[in-house]
């Protein structure tokens, strides 16, 4: 299915229990990192802590290469390779804790994200959308400007432990404004 559609949902890529542990860890990390930054224990540019200044989704908590998320990447590589039929090389993990009002504008990924994944850890439901045509519809990503008549895309709904794997450089993907309280991916 992946080779034909360039995306595939993997239900139960990790257990619900492990997803819940990772989601709670993400929440605690966001609270701790926010406290450390606000109390001058560390600074926003410290690569060992996450931040709330993500350019792509301002206001969300984001962290590059978190140790637990790296472990989840390693843990899921076998199932990703099996489902895609590709030999994959893990490059990095990037995690976000989304908050009410966050938007992930329609975009394609950079080359290091050739094969991308989003793993639902927990929180309120928030679908991700993909345009399976592979067309270029984005005029200005950070302003959310797309071409008139752009396809509405395929809605993908994930539950904790479910994973979407997709060709990030080929397929535009996005999320509409988040109406829930928190969502960890």
Describe each model-derived feature in a short phrase.
Residues 75-79, 94, 116:
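Generic beta-strand or strand-like secondary-structure segments
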Residues 1-84:
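Non-heme Fe(II)/2-oxoglutarate
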Residues 97:
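Conserved active-site beta-strand element of glycosyltransferases/polysaccharide synthases
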Residues 100-174, 182-183:
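Catalytic core of non-heme Fe(II) oxygenases with the double-stranded beta-helix
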Residues 85-94:
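A short coil-to-beta-strand element that immediately follows conserved catalytic motifs
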Residues 81, 85-86, 122-126:
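Short helix-capping and hinge/turn segments at secondary-structure transitions, especially at repeat
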Residues 54-58, 174, 184-185:
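Short, active-site-adjacent segments that bind or coordinate small-molecule cofactors and metal centers
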């Amino acid at each position: 299915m992946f080779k034909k559609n360039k995306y595939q949902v993997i239900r139960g890529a990790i257990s619900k229990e492990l997803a819940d542990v990772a989601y709670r860890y993400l929440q605690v990390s966001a609270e701790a990192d926010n406290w450390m930054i606000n109390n001058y224990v560390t600074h926003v540019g410290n690569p060992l802590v996450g931040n709330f200044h993500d350019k792509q989704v301002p206001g969300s908590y984001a962290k590059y290469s978190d140790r637990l998320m790296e472990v989840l990447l390693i843990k899921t590589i076998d199932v990703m390779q099996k489902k895609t039929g590709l030999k994959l090389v893990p490059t990095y993990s990037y995690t976000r804790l989304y908050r009410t009002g966050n938007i992930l504008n329609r975009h394609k990924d950079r080359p290091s994200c050739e094969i991308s994944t989003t793993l639902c850890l927990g929180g309120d439901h928030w679908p991700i959308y993909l345009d399976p045509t592979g067309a270029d519809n984005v005029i200005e990503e950070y302003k959310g400007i797309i071409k008139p008549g752009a396809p509405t895309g395929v809605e993908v709904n994930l539950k904790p432990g479910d994973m979407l794997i997709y060709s990030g450089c080929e397929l535009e993907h996005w999320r509409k404004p988040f109406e829930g309280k928190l969502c960890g991916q």
